[in-house]
Amino acid sequence: MTRLASGVLITLLVALAGIADGSRDIAGDILKLPSEAYRFFHNGGGGAKVNDDDDSVGTRWAVLLAGSNGFWNYRHQADICHAYQLLRKGGLKDENIIVFMYDDIAFNEENPRPGVIINHPHGDDVYKGVPKDYTGEDVTVEKFFAVVLGNKTALTGGSGKVVDSGPNDHIFIFYSDHGGPGVLGMPTSRYIYADELIDVLKKKHASGNYKSLVFYLEACESGSIFEGLLLEGLNIYATTASNAEESSWGTYCPGEIPGPPPEYSTCLGDLYSIAWMEDSDIHNLRTETLHQQYELVKTRTASYNSYGSHVMQYGDIGLSKNNLFTYLGTNPANDNYTFVDENSLRPASKAVNQRDADLLHFWDKYRKAPEGTPRKAEAQKQFFEAMSHRMHVDHSIKLIGKLLFGIEKGPEILNTVRPAGQPLVDDWGCLKSLVRTFESHCGALSQYGMKHMRSLANICNTGIGKEKMAEASAQACENIPSGPWSSLDKGFSA
């Protein structure tokens, strides 16, 4: 291996290890015993209680969205397929489940089990039977918003299914992909921005076409999508894989314990996602509340105070007293498996930073490929292309900060984090404009570059506009790199 390859490998290993801070406390000390929580919420916790035992009260609806493509992002579509199987076993009908996924994983040439997707090292196929509602180029922001709003006339392509809900219905939305401060990835064209998503949820509430809505969100910095934006009073309860400033984590990854079967070179799931689904898989969900699951997922996703993230909750927290059955149904096979602490907390899972999972895939693919084969050469090329793109984006953003604010003030302004409870940016239109300006001169941010959204938001918050940003970007980037990660073939991300 060349010196450069060795150096990059060391960089990768350091990145995958993360930064351990022995003083931090991810899980905190607020985990109640499930029995105590159950008594609190059912014997005087306050507020109106949904009759979770009455199937005749409203219809359950679900929207499941995997926002990525590419085999290195296997885990996101695996999460979504697993969620579909869980909901079907819970009694939801296909007509009430809308699935968005690119669908390039099951029959991908990299898949060691063609036509099969697994979400656990010893798991069953979760791909079989999943409806192809919106796949490929139909997985767009516009179609997702139209589906949530029940706007059939805005749809072309796909199955045409929408959330055609009524005032007594309950809606569950689950998203899994990469994210960044204020933004969620999509496999086509532009990304989902927090202000637009919140506007859609407000419109859905104003229509009077649901009784309550639960949103589970798997992405890096996912707390920033709701923090300071999702207000009480919309009958919406949301939990996120991480707070507004940190990465979420992939799990069941190569080299970890437990890891995927040896023929796999990619992570099978995401830590927050498998935490809530593996909990739901084994319990009678008539006896478990959203709050109980939140606490359990919070503990497991924190990896018991090692590597992990802070699971957060937003919106109408009072809805968390509702049983999961209200949104997910329940598998009759679990009728005798009441939620109690002794059978709920699973062993800790090792995890990989969400943004490093693609590098891990390329490295594992390279490591396993026989010497001198095209596969080994391809893996090496993919690895170096990804690393080169990362270095380009990081350098460009840092240089733009210094050009705009000076060598000393630049890093300080770019890295500023607003106090908890405040939204990421004052002017979302400015943020989107600066994203387009940066990408016009420097190339696509990509799933990795989304991490710099806070820096671009901070530039907006200082009053810098499009013209000054264009001038600095032109100085920082003489041209757009030719690699696939920088390509703008699919358009701008804003």
Swiss-Prot record:
InterPro entries in alphabetical order: AE, Legum_prodom, Legumain_prodom_sf, Peptidase_C13
Active site per database record: 178, 220
Site feature: Required for post-translational maturation and enzyme activity: 267
Signal peptide from the UniProt entry: 1-20
Keywords per UniProt: Disulfide bond, Glycoprotein, Hydrolase, Protease, Signal, Thiol protease
Glycosites: 151, 336
GO BP: any one term: proteolysis involved in protein catabolic process
Disulphide connectivity of cysteines: 253-267, 430-460, 442-477
Enzyme Commission number, as recorded: 3.4.22.-
Expression across tissues: High levels are seen in the flowers, a lower level expression is seen in the leaves, while very low levels are seen in the stems and roots.
GO MF terms held by the record: cysteine-type endopeptidase activity
PANTHER family given in the database record: HEMOGLOBINASE FAMILY MEMBER, VACUOLAR-PROCESSING ENZYME GAMMA-ISOZYME
Cited function: Asparagine-specific endopeptidase that may be involved in processing of proteins targeted to vacuoles that accumulate during ethylene-regulated processes such as flower opening and flavedo degreening.
Family named by the database record: Belongs to the peptidase C13 family.
Protein's UniProt name: Vacuolar-processing enzyme
